[in-house]
A protein has these predicted regions:
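A detector of low-complexity, intrinsically disordered, Ser/Thr/Gly/Pro/Ala-rich segments
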Residues: 52, 136, 482, 495-498
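Signature aromatic-anchored transmembrane alpha helix within multi-pass, membrane-resident enzymes
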Residues: 347-379
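Short, charged low-complexity linker/loop segments at the C-terminal edge of domains
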Residues: 348, 486-491
Length: 502
């Protein structure tokens, strides 16, 4: 038993198990509403319509909220592997492997071979990275860009190859195409602060191709911005002012064209960071300096190595501390630096500034919690979906496909469900009007109606009596089919029917 536990705590073994678990979830877990399925459906529409410039929120409705890099990645997978979970997620996962490779290489160069494995295993075991590493969202693409920039800048300052300098600007271009100017705000201030504290401005000026690198960055990112504004005028105003200013400064911002604001108290991002890095953040609890002088020695040693990791880890969180409209994925850019710090504390030598050896992050307890989390994610996603924090319409769509006959149709009543659009490849209708349900029931062919259970009382009784239950999924959606033994409803005005209960 001890041998098994010891092997599971070995960083390469733990990393391999976690990646296999994530790959299994990538293939088997359904797309959930609203975020992941929304981006997956946008990518599917991109392939269907052949419009790779303007992402579409609905057919003919531009999606201005985010640049298209992550949607390009998903659309490429759908183009190659079909409209399924694997196709829409695989290149997001490839991007995550790129992040792990960058983090492992940086830790290996700075701290040794073992530290590279440790940093990669710790990062993969953090719940926030584990989820985002194959989720169809924009966050992983942004992380790839910021990590490339930060790792390559550190490499260039240590006398690395010339491509390291160009990697800084390539990372910024990736970030601009993933989430826009936010990539610059996340990457450049910690670099500037590090240069200011260490005084290595001249080295930075000599080590980086500032002019040609900037040209490369603009050549990679600017053409899409110009093409998007030309194709759908008004994009730049909404994207730059709305998404990059009002979203973070206006509590409960109502200008979001594609969703709802997420009002939170200032400082909530620190809670998200702790939850997103648990349990590995516990490895920092005893990493307290014995004195300010000892901390300075450690932080400035090896060309300011410790200071660089700290600034990289703290800045994304500090920047969003006053923000009133954030979601739980916002601490993600800080996690690679946090993983490298933990890898350093995991080493056999203890930094001189620390009073005593820190607890090794790859302890049986931390590794066990991480593996339990991964196992629970698989069990919930595949066997207990009603316990999942987010729901999917995949089971309902599969049931409809089994029940349907030629000429049958499905209409969704209630909030828009992007996963239903993805799994039917756009082959459903959506309405919030009970009158539309009545019209479809009077049309030729058999009608299936899907709706959340709590929307059923909103359907007038004459309409509801024509629906026969097919299946329901706990507190989630329910599927109904048109009854064939009811009289025709032509001539009934649903708007004039009595409310439920009368």
């Amino acid at each position: 038993m001890r041998t098994i536990v010891r092997r599971l705590c070995n960083p390469p073994v733990l990393l391999g198990i976690l990646l296999v678990c994530r790959l299994a979830l990538l293939i088997l877990a359904p797309h959930t509403d609203p975020s992941e399925s929304r981006y997956a459906e946008i990518a599917r529409k991109m392939v269907e319509t052949g419009d790779w410039i303007t992402p579409q929120f609905d057919y003919g409705v531009p999606f201005w909220a985010k640049p298209p890099l992550s949607m390009w990645m998903s659309a490429l997978g759908i183009e190659l592997f079909g409209v399924n979970e694997f196709g829409s997620r695989i290149f997001i996962f490839v991007g995550a492997l790129g992040v792990l490779a960058l983090v492992a290489d940086a830790a290996r160069r700075e701290l040794g071979k073992e530290a590279g494995w440790t940093a990669a295993a710790v990062l993969t075991g953090m719940p926030l990275f584990f989820y985002c590493s194959a989720a169809v969202m924009t966050d992983l693409a942004l992380l790839l860009g910021t990590t490339l920039t930060m790792v390559c800048f550190r490499g260039a300052m240590r006398g690395g190859p010339r491509w390291s300098g160009y990697g800084v600007f390539a990372g910024l271009a990736i970030g601009l195409l993933a989430k826009g100017p936010l990539a610059l705000v996340i990457s450049l201030p910690p670099i500037a602060a590090w240069l200011l504290i260490t005084g290595r401005w001249r080295t930075a000026w000599r080590s980086l191709p500032w002019f040609t690198g900037t040209v490369v960055m603009l050549l990679l990112a600017l053409p899409w911005y110009l093409a998007a504004e030309r194709k759908t005028p008004g994009f730049l105003d909404y994207f730059l002012m709305g998404e990059h200013w009002n979203r973070f400064t206006v509590r409960g911002w109502q200008g979001d064209l594609y969703g709802n604001a997420h009002p939170v108290a200032p400082g909530m991002i620190w809670v998200y960071l702790l939850l997103g890095s648990f349990p590995w953040c516990l490895g920092l609890l005893r990493a307290r300096p014995a004195s300010w002088r000892g901390f300075r020695i450690w932080a400035m040693a090896h060309h300011g190595r410790g200071l660089y990791w700290i600034l990289w880890a703290l800045w994304p969180v500090a920047f969003f501390t006053p923000a009133r409209n954030i979601i739980a994925t916002y601490p993600l850019p800080a996690l690679p630096a946090l993983a490298i710090l933990l890898a350093e504390f995991h080493g056999t030598t203890t930094p001189a500034s620390l009073p005593k050896p820190v607890p090794r992050p790859l302890s049986p307890m931390l590794a066990g919690i991480t593996l339990a989390f991964a196992a629970w994610a698989i069990v919930v996603s595949l066997f207990l979906p009603e316990l999942a924090p987010k729901q999917s319409e995949r089971a309902l769509i599969r049931r409809f496909e089994r029940e349907r006959s030629p000429g049958d149709r499905l209409i969704y009543y209630g909030p828009r469900k992007y996963s239903s659009e993805f799994y039917t490849e756009g082959g459903i209708d959506h309405t919030v009007s009970a009158g539309t349900i009545a019209e479809r029931l009077d049309s030729p062919g058999r009608t299936f109606v899907a709706l959340p259970s709590y929307w059923l009382p909103l359907i007038p009784p004459p309409v509801r009596r024509r629906l026969l239950p097919v299946a329901s999924w706990g507190p989630g959606p329910s599927l109904y089919v048109e009854r064939t033994d009811m009289p025709d409803m032509s001539g009934i005005d649903p708007s004039r029917t009595s409310p439920i209960g009368n």
